């Protein structure tokens, strides 16, 4: 019974991840892959009873979180470049925040600085060019 429920959950998770394919970019897939790798490693280390289960669950959750954060950051950067003003996305619980701010216009492209916050602390800053 546990195996059947696990397989159903795994198939459901795979379906959810693959259904996002219409709007995803290469960077979203890369974010999901990194999230899956980190999640799998954490799951293996944390689930001492069944390391395979921990790895699979960690990979699934990590892929979803990594892909989602990457997609949100890309959307924020694109909106900031198009509207020429800062854009902020926050998680409902306030634990995560992405802030994208246009820095400089270069022809058809805009340099956007994206800051990632976790629990109110700055964890990452990146600059990227967003072109029309």
Swiss-Prot record:
InterPro entries: Gly-zipper_YMGG (IPR027367). Residues 1-19 form the signal peptide. One of its GO terms (cellular component) is plasma membrane. It is a lipid-anchor. Keywords: Cell membrane, Lipoprotein, Membrane, Palmitate, Signal. It holds the Pfam family Gly-zipper_YMGG. A lipid is attached at residue 20 (N-palmitoyl cysteine). It comes from the Bacteria. A lipid is attached at residue 20 (S-diacylglycerol cysteine). It is found in: Cell membrane. This is Uncharacterized lipoprotein aq_615.
